[in-house]
């Protein structure tokens, strides 16, 4: 694991370039702070949010708007259609190339997002299994239903299952795909080979996170989550794994008559709050961010980055 306390020694600048990562749970304010930091230091933003890698999933993922992307150049957004899954290994390869290019051009790279596993793969050199997507197997798993799939994973690879939420169809299917294709559980196939970067992790974890999540959920429904979900369902079918993820799953139930919009908003809020709790646990156990705890997160982050650039 990259440790912050050893990054900024007297010779650190000569040894390796600096990668700054702004992390934290959903609705913690990462997007707004990332834009301010990028503008202050004249940086570009590299996305590490797993759902924002997909095109046509804008509202439900709180993807940076067109106006925000005009303010600051973003990378690693809209890489594929939502019916073309991106494996962790594929993300790692694409993101490593993007980081290397930005470092070459600007001397510092700036990551922002809430997907801890993707951050770990990129900054700690996690080596995921090289198993390509298996379309037929995924169709079979989808037909079983997510509850059965997660139960299968608990039996076959309890270590991997413990790290995946029961409702997370995308990661559950991927873990089973790796297991059935290679004969080895995913948890036994991951090693690390850290890249030659210094990594400064900055974390956001506001006290009012629960109310921020409730406000964010209401906002995405008001902005058109139901219509976005309708279009995705019509184009790719209602069994699309990405339509089982938080927000889209509840919106799909509204469209199918299973939930009222008010019920869907309440369920999405609850699921997001549960997910945010898991995100905080992940960042606490798997990373060592400087938590921005002061009243002025921007000034605190600027000071830490300037020290890193030193």
Swiss-Prot record:
Its cofactor is Mg(2+). It is an enzyme of class 2 (transferase). Keywords: ATP-binding, Magnesium, Nucleotide-binding, Transferase, tRNA processing. Pfam families: IPPT. The record marks 115 as: Interaction with substrate tRNA. It comes from the Bacteria. Signal peptide: none annotated. Its EC number is 2.5.1.75. ATP binds at residues 24-31. Substrate binds at residues 26-31. GO terms for biological process: tRNA modification. InterPro entries: Dimethylallyltransferase (IPR039657), IPT (IPR018022), P-loop_NTPase (IPR027417). Residues 49-52 are annotated as: Interaction with substrate tRNA. Gene3D superfamilies: 1.10.20.140, P-loop containing nucleotide triphosphate hydrolases (3.40.50.300). It catalyses: adenosine(37) in tRNA + dimethylallyl diphosphate = N(6)-dimethylallyladenosine(37) in tRNA + diphosphate. GO terms for molecular function: ATP binding; tRNA dimethylallyltransferase activity. HAMAP family: IPP_trans. NCBIfam families: miaA. PANTHER family: TRNA DIMETHYLALLYLTRANSFERASE (PTHR11088:SF60). Catalyzes the transfer of a dimethylallyl group onto the adenine at position 37 in tRNAs that read codons beginning with uridine, leading to the formation of N6-(dimethylallyl)adenosine (i(6)A). Belongs to the IPP transferase family. Monomer. This is tRNA dimethylallyltransferase. The gene is miaA.
């Amino acid at each position: 694991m990259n440790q912050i306390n050893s990054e900024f020694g007297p010779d650190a600048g000569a040894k390796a370039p600096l990668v700054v990562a702004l992390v934290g749970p959903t609705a913690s304010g990462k997007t707004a702070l990332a834009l301010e930091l990028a503008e202050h230091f004249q940086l570009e933003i590299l996305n590490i949010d797993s759902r924002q890698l997909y095109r046509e999933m804008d509202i439900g993922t709180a993807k940076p708007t067109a106006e925000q992307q005009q303010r600051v150049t973003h990378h690693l957004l809209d890489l594929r259609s939502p019916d073309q899954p991106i494996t962790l290994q594929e993300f790692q390869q694409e993101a490593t190339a993007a980081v290397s290019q930005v470092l070459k051009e600007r001397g510092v790279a700036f990551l922002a997002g809430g997907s801890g596993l993707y951050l770990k793969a990129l900054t700690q050199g996690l080596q995921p299994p090289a198993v390509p997507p298996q379309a037929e197997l995924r169709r079979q798993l989808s037909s079983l239903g997510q509850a059965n799939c997660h139960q299968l994973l608990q039996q076959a690879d309890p270590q991997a299952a413990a790290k995946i939420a029961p409702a997370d169809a995308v990661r559950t299917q991927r873990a089973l795909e790796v297991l059935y294709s290679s004969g080895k559980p995913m948890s036994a196939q991951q090693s690390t080979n850290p890249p030659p970067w210094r990594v400064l992790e900055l974390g956001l974890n506001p006290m009012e996170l629960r109310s921020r999540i409730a406000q964010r959920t209401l906002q995405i429904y008001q902005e058109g989550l139901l219509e976005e979900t309708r279009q995705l369902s019509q184009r790719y079918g209602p069994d699309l794994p990405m339509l089982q993820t938080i927000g889209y799953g509840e919106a799909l139930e509204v469209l199918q008559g299973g939930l009222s919009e008010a019920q869907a908003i309440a369920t999405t809020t609850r699921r997001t709050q549960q997910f945010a709790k898991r995100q905080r646990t992940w960042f606490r156990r798997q990373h060592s961010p400087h938590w921005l705890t002061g009243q002025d997160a921007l000034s605190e982050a600027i000071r830490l980055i300037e020290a890193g650039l030193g």
